[in-house]
Amino acid sequence: MKTTNHGCTARRTALAVLGAGALAAVLPQAAQAQAFPNKPIRWVVPYAAGGGADANARLLAQPVSVLLGQPIVVENKPGASGVLAAQAVIQAPADGYTLLFDTFPYAVNAVLRKLPFDPFKDLVPVSQAINMPNILVVPAAAPYKTFEEMLDYARAHPGKLDYASYGAGGSAHLAAELLRRDAGIDWVHVPYKGGAPAITDLLAGQVSAYFANPVSGLPYVQSGKLRALATTGARRMEALPDVPTVRESGYKDFEVVEWNGFFAPAGTPQAVIDRLSSAVQEATRQPEVRKRLVGMGIEPVGNSPQEFRTFLDGQISRWGALVKANRITVD
């Protein structure tokens, strides 16, 4: 007489159904990642053409485009320290074809202003591309030749000096406010919609100083049109070995590092996020790309979505606390 184990058969059937269901859930994402991308990709930059973020995006677009096999279109959407660009990306389809290429203010905007969106829920990190210290630059005709001379001048003439920023809440803004606090100087904030117009007015002598990123500031320092007084990193820049850090002047905790990274709309398939992140990581590891970046005073990063998330959490914690403690505003 043949005995049938109905319990075992039922369990095997249930497991088979579960396995098929899991496979069915994975296959569409895998297929989507394999098919992605099949049309041009748009990178939205929150600042004006010609500034540091714009230049960095365009530099990275070429190798990433080759790796993905599709053209990359860089679109500038300046205004409100990145808010307008972020909104445009959030409202785009969550398919990986529209990314935000943002920078330092992303981590402090939620502390500085009331936003019409949640930057930590409506956007997801893809990859941090680069890091770079700022360079404190002044017009070549400025009366002060060194960092300490500028501080002495500022202390002797309270409120006379002003400083440019590429937008409220950016690294140039917070670096200047940190210096106000640490060095005891009084100077006036003049915000611009991007680094390019800030540099233009600095060259014309319309503003006293600017914590420029290397992309926009370094060429003018090297040509003698601007004077570099200090840099904001933990160590001297390879591209400017003779320019001291702010730390070297006795401000041992002073460090401000600009960064650029990619974000996608929430809901973008993880497989697509991973594909995009891998392309950025691979591009920043290419010897020729690294050589160009380092020569511009930039540190290539290229990390995973989770590593970028961890970095952002640290930035939000540090700068959020500082903004609140020192009552820094967007004004």
How should these model regions be labeled?
Residues N131, G217-R285, S317:
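C-terminal lobe and pocket-closing loops
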Residues M1-T9, T13-V26:
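N-terminal secretory signal peptides
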Residues G50, F104, P139-Y144, Y166-G170, ...:
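Short coil/turn segments
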Residues N38-P40, R181-I185, Q222, E248, ...:
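An extracytoplasmic/periplasmic, membrane-proximal ligand-sensing/linker region
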Residues Q91-Y97, A110-P197, V246, W259-R292:
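Hinge/capping helix and adjacent helix->loop/strand transition within the periplasmic-binding protein
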